[in-house]
Amino acid sequence: MSLVTVGIGDLAVTGDPRAVIVTHGLGSCIALVAWDPGLRVGGMLHFQLPASALSPERALDAPGTFADTGIPLLFHRLYARGCRKEALVVKAAGGGSFNDRGGAFDIGRRNHAAMWRILRHARVAVVAEDVGGSRSRTVRLFLDSGRVTVQSGDQVAPL
């Protein structure tokens, strides 16, 4: 097994069947996972904020930080590996809320809304998601099978 760790604002794409792509500590951030079962190529993005307009300079240095720059980059890299949009199995997890202020301060909800807006516009379907709540998550994508798990504490569940 080859472990590929995706940090905050980062992404990874691989076709190594021995690889497991993992990201830890998802709070309000969202992990977007995509896997092509025919090619056995997959990727994961761990984005932190909904819009690059918040920091255009940071978007240039770390486009994976933002939904509006990271999501297109993830799909661009998957397409560069031969993946086709209609073949991709796309899943998402994270987007939690950890304060009672709501509104503009509810980054998890804003991240989730931005993700859906971008994916709808691109006509990309999400087949499963585990979002919201107030728990931290670890997400794993197993490249040999496309299996995605979400771990919160000691509980591991398929997505």
UniProtKB/Swiss-Prot annotation:
Key words, A-Z: Chemotaxis, Hydrolase
Catalysed reaction, written as an equation: L-glutaminyl-[protein] + H2O = L-glutamyl-[protein] + NH4(+)
UniProt-listed InterPro entries: CheD-like_sf, Chemorcpt_Glu_NH3ase_CheD, Cytotoxic_necrot_fac-like_cat
Gene Ontology MF terms: protein-glutamine glutaminase activity
Any single GO BP term: chemotaxis
Pfam families, sorted: CheD
Disulfide linkage: none
Domain of life: Bacteria
Record-listed E.C. numbers: 3.5.1.44
Function: Probably deamidates glutamine residues to glutamate on methyl-accepting chemotaxis receptors (MCPs), playing an important role in chemotaxis.
Family label: Belongs to the CheD family.
Protein name per the record: Probable chemoreceptor glutamine deamidase CheD 2
